[in-house]
Amino acid sequence: MANIKSAKKRIKVIETKTLRNKMIKSALKTKIKNFEVAVANNDLNEAKSAYTIVVKALDMAAAKGILHKNKAARKKSRLATKLSGLNA
């Protein structure tokens, strides 16, 4: 346990940020799952709208530093491949 006042504050700040990051990651996983369900059901319109939502969420997570920008780009690429497979 920290004894210094600033260290105690940093612990509180880290806990707050960790909670926020977990919430954002959880919401992101839910959005990705919704997209994959739409793709599995061969619902093109639903998949397109879900894809735009997922891409926006991935970009925001990358901008906030929750995900690395390359990981976000990789996920977007793989989801786009699934979407294009649905178009064909």
Swiss-Prot record:
One of its GO terms (biological process) is translation. One of its GO terms (molecular function) is small ribosomal subunit rRNA binding. Keywords: Ribonucleoprotein, Ribosomal protein, RNA-binding, rRNA-binding. InterPro entries: Ribosomal_bS20 (IPR002583), Ribosomal_bS20_sf (IPR036510). GO terms for cellular component: cytosol; small ribosomal subunit. The keyword Ribosomal protein applies. Pfam families: Ribosomal_S20p (PF01649). Binds directly to 16S ribosomal RNA. Belongs to the bacterial ribosomal protein bS20 family. This is Small ribosomal subunit protein bS20. It comes from Clostridium novyi (strain NT).
